[in-house]
């Protein structure tokens, strides 16, 4: 019997080479006054930033432009919102990575309401957002967060009392997601690696999540197959390999859909305090913590062969295996080793490179949530996972 489940709406999706050229046409659906948010680096080095701005201006669009240089903070969002609240913006367009997507989503949601975004953040503010927003169009330049598919914007403040919290409402899903793999060709190698590991983590965590359903399972498994086939190729050949970029773009898109409907697990549980207390990029946290967390997860589930998560981990292990016709335990052991190998090949930085050390382990463990992870790890296992990445 299939358990009941709920699947909410998705953006209009325009996927494929050259789809960025649809932007002027779709912008006009909402009006001619556009607030464009972009990242600070690769999009401009590639020439796509100038290309997109020229196309919008050539179509008679009144363009305002803001650069997002880092993960959005409450002060960043509040400042942009105050600048444009009285400007009759018709549509917000975000062209960039996950941070730009989150910033665009947050700005589009905050322009119509009063007060600081802090007042509406989950677990921090006391107000419930009414869901009003300016229409939002997402055009990602990385294959990672899948934020172009999600209903939340992640907002961070780094420091001793830092946090990573979400602004969330069903209405915050972008109206249109334009996913053009050509936009990813110029993505730097290091960012390709860490963004790819974020997508990988989201797919695996949502696949084995306690909230998974048949639709998220189908998308997550296909996304994981794409990760197996294309992640390393995008890392090694990404500047010229449009097939690998397309495969990773689809995997990231699927990861955004599955995390929205099935939730995430312990790796993302670690990401909240690590990203709040230290200036560690989100993809680095995922890339660092995935192998140790899932090694302990497999160990804790090994005596539960009928557990749905255990059965799914066997399926994923077979997807990533380089052999056939072995026992399940051999596949699972191979998958643990494969995760370590991928982390090494992608040259994922250690957490210590960002100031994290032994003395911070208890604080991180204390503030980490298991979310929808299929099994609890002990405090000792969580500490060991962190320690392995110092």
Predicted segments with their positions:
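A glycine/threonine-rich phosphate-anchoring loop and its flanking beta-alpha core
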Residues: 11, 21, 113-212, 308-315
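Gly/Pro-rich interdomain helix-loop hinge
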Residues: 280, 284-359
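ATP/NTP phosphate-donor binding region
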Residues: 1-91
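Short Gly/Thr/Asp-enriched flexible loops that form oxyanion-binding sites at enzyme active sites
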Residues: 81, 100-114, 149-152
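Glycine/serine-rich anion-binding loops at beta->alpha junctions
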Residues: 89-105, 141-148, 280
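Short, amphipathic C-terminal "tail helix"
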Residues: 358-390
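Short glycine/serine/threonine-rich phosphate/pyrophosphate-binding segments
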Residues: 20-23, 45-48, 74-77, 99-104, ...
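C-terminal and late-domain segments of enzyme folds
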Residues: 189-254, 258
